[in-house]
Regions:
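Metal-ion/cofactor- or nucleotide/acyl-coenzyme-handling active-site neighborhoods
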Residues: 1-197
Length: 197
């Protein structure tokens, strides 16, 4: 078995801490929830082998998918195998958590970076890109008040920030043989196998 490394792209504002050079130091890239690449290549590069998304997100165009080099689409919506395989207490996993768990369970992935995993904090901006760049299929989230005009989450997320934090720390402790990196606006403590960037 040859070892692999993967950078998993979330969409939180902490993406601003990232660089293309950091992303390019990983063998593979997984995009979660259809992040915006155009105009942000200096932060997140311009490639993704995996496209993890639920059915509410507008798919990348064929041209975008080819340009990014997407080879695998993984549906994270309800009733899918990836969602049914996940179990960790009462945590309702986001697409990013499902992607992380997918690679966590594969022994060949020994180096995993989580970029933009800001844990859906209430009254914090949710995405690194501008409101006008947001997927038009999800404008209802502004219309119903889930997000305010600044793109901040106004409600307690169904994904539950504290449960995500506990899950991630449990996995960092359980998989001591893997090296983890995290870019997050949430306060994580470094561990022997976790570098907080």
């Amino acid at each position: 078995m040859s070892e692999k490394s993967i950078a998993i792209l979330g969409k939180g504002p902490s993406v601003d801490k990232c660089t293309k050079e950091f992303i390019d130091s990983f063998d593979e890239v997984a995009a979660c929830g259809r992040p915006v690449f155009t105009g942000y290549e200096h932060l997140i590069g311009n490639r993704a082998k995996y496209d993890f998304a639920n059915r509410t997100a507008t798919p990348y165009t064929q041209e975008e998918a080819q340009r990014l080099g997407i080879e695998h689409f993984i549906d994270t919506g309800g009733g899918t195998k990836i969602r049914e395989r996940f179990s960790h207490g009462d945590l309702d996993p986001s697409t990013g958590i499902l992607a992380f768990h997918h690679f966590l369970e594969k022994p060949e992935y020994t180096k995993i970076a989580l970029i933009g995993f800001d844990l859906f904090q209430t009254m914090e901006k949710v995405y690194y890109y501008k409101n006008e760049e947001f997927d038009p299929a999800l404008t209802w989230l502004w219309e119903n008040g889930t997000y305010d005009s600044e793109g901040r989450l106004t409600i307690v997320s169904g994904h539950k920030t504290e449960l995500i934090f506990k899950y991630l720390n449990d996995m960092f402790d359980l998989y001591k043989d893997k090296q983890f990196y995290i870019m997050s606006s949430y306060k994580f403590s470094e561990k022997e196998n976790l570098k907080v960037l």
